[in-house]
Structures are given as C-alpha cells and as structure tokens.
Amino acid sequence: MAPPQRCPLCRQTFFCGRGHVYSHKHQRQLKGALERLLPQVEAARRAVRAAQVERYVPEHDRCCWCPCCGCEVRKHLSHGNLTVLHGGLLEHLASPEHKKATNKFWWENKANAQMKEKFLISPQDYARFKKSMVKGLDSYEEKEDEVIKEMAAQIREVEQSRQEVVRSVLEPQAESDPEEGSSAPESWKATNGHVASSSQQVSHLALQPVAELDWMETGQQLTFIGHQDTPGIGNIHSGATPPWMIQEEEHSSGSLPIGPSYEEFLKEKEKQKLKKLPPDRVGANFDHSSNTSAGWLPSFGRVWNNGRRWQSRHQFKTEAATRSKQPRKGKS
C-alpha cells in the first residue's frame, strides 16, 4: 500500500500514490485553479507595453492567489501616493522563484504543457514594462502639473472677481463721504432742536391736571384680582404645609387598622378556592357556618352510624322481619 499523501488542490489525503493526479477530480480542480488566475495574468500582459499610473486608493492593496507558488501576491505596485497597476503581479511572474515553482507544479500535477508559458513573464517583457512604467510616471506628473495650473488659474479668477466686487462697493462710498461731512453739523442741529421741542411737550403735558374718570364717581365696588390670602387655607405657593405632610386625627390615633383583617383574609382565600370548583356541584349552597348535632346523619337505608357493621345488619333484618309480620296480623 502506498504511503498517504496530501493534495493541496483537492484538499484531501489519498492512498493511491501518483495515480491521484490522473483522476478526474484532480484534473477538474487543477483546471479551475488555473482558470481563476489566467484572466489576471492576461490583464497584466496588456499592461506591459502601456503601464498605467494612478493615485493610490485602498482598493490597490488587493492580492491574488498563485497556485504554482502556493502564496498570495499583490496585484499592484504602490509607493507613496502613486500606484502602478498590475506591477506587483508582473514582478512576481518574472521572478526566477516563480519560474522554478511553476515547472515543479506542472510536473507534479501533470498539467497541460502548452499553458505553462501563459503563466510566465520573460525578462525582456519585464524590461519593456519598466520602460513603459517610466513613461507612465512622466505623463502622470505632466497631467498633475496641468491640473495644478488649472486650479491656480481658477483661484486667481475668483480672487480677482472678489477684489472687483469689493472695489465697486467702496468707490461710491468714498465719493459720498465729503458731502456727508459738510451736511453733518446741520443735521446735528436739526436733531437737537427736535429733541428739545419734544421734551418741552412732555413737560407741558405733565403739568396739566389729570381728569377724574367716570367710574370713580359712580362708587361701584371693584373686585381685586391679585394675591388673596384666605384665612386658615393655604397652598404650597403661600408656604402652607402640603396635605401629605398633615397628620390627621383618625390616622394618628391608630384605631383604624390598615388593610383587611386576618379573618377577612381567610374568608377571601376560601372563596378563591371555591371559585375553582364547578358551581352545580352537590352541596355548593351548603352553609358550613351552621351548627349541627351529632345525629344529623339519616337513619334510613341502614346507614352505619355507630357500632360494628354486622350489628347494624342484624338490626336491619330484625326490623324488616317485624314489618313483614305486622300486615299478616292485620289480615288475620
């Protein structure tokens, strides 16, 4: 029996030796792993001749899984605020470690030999990518300079328009300042004269006698609306004691108990028990508080009142015999 081996693609242990790599399950898992990596490799190959440089965003930190090396690889190459798209994956595919791991992976898993070149980047292609990356960085810097110049021009235009608005507001005020200075004393005199005349009118009105009102002469009594103190009655606003702080005589004497008595509690408890029983039961209306004597049990039907059972049986037989003899004597 072959020793157990672990397959990383199928994620299981098999005991059939090298025959596992030829199974349909293993070949299906191998094909799926390579198809997941192939679109990303093709996108990286398209970036060899025209490298794209963009501003860094957190999405550029994504990684992809390389089944040949069995590790994660960063897709993009970032430095500071700049990111070269597909730079990390191209650098990994062009490394000698990846080439060695790919040859081993193809040999162990018996993959299609024609597809191996698709997952490798030659040194010539990687050198071409470096040259295009330099050109991409230069073009990106030129675009950034143009954007900065456009923003600076917009800032200058806004500042110039703001200064023109301020100048247009201040010029009319500067022209009207001399005229306002010459007319200031005249306006001051006019205002002073107006204030003096108004003060004289107020003093003249104050000296005139106030006419008495008609309702004062009629002698009608008026109701005072304001703070009224009722003797003996107060509230919390007038400083009186709150009602919950007053000790009443009934409660202070302690003659009245608080809550029901113990007897009432027992009666209520008994009523609650009787409510659970059916209302049409025998003896539902029986008064348990009535007094009964010891001979309350009926004597008919030979009820066993006292003594032994056989005594009552013999007594019943003798009484029945006497009752049967009495009608015979009557007939005779």
From Swiss-Prot:
Region of interest (Required for centrosome location), ranges: 1-169
PTMs per UniProt: Acetylated. Acetylation oscillates throughout the cell cycle, and the acetylation state at Lys-31 is regulated by the deacetylase SIRT1 and the acetyltransferase NAT10. Deacetylated CENATAC is responsible for its centrosome targeting, and acetylated CENATAC promotes SASS6 degradation by enhancing the binding affinity of SASS6 for APC/C E3 ubiquitin-protein ligase complex/FZR1.
Keyword vocabulary terms for this entry: Acetylation, Coiled coil, mRNA processing, mRNA splicing
Ranges in a coiled coil: 137-168
List of residues that carry N6-acetyllysine: K31
Span list, region Disordered: 170-201, 311-332
Gene Ontology biological process terms, A to Z: chromosome separation; mRNA splicing, via spliceosome; negative regulation of centrosome duplication; regulation of protein catabolic process
Pfam families per record: CCDC84 (PF14968)
Gene Ontology cellular component annotations, sorted alphabetically: centrosome
Keyword Coiled coil among UniProt keywords: yes
PANTHER family per the UniProt record, alphabetical: CENTROSOMAL AT-AC SPLICING FACTOR, COILED-COIL DOMAIN-CONTAINING PROTEIN 84
Subunit structure and binding partners: Interacts with SASS6; the interaction increases with CENATAC acetylation.
Function: Component of the minor spliceosome that promotes splicing of a specific, rare minor intron subtype. Negative regulator of centrosome duplication. Constrains centriole number by modulating the degradation of the centrosome-duplication-associated protein SASS6 in an acetylation-dependent manner. SIRT1 deacetylates CENATAC in G1 phase, allowing for SASS6 accumulation on the centrosome and subsequent procentriole assembly.
Protein name: Centrosomal AT-AC splicing factor
Species name: Mus musculus
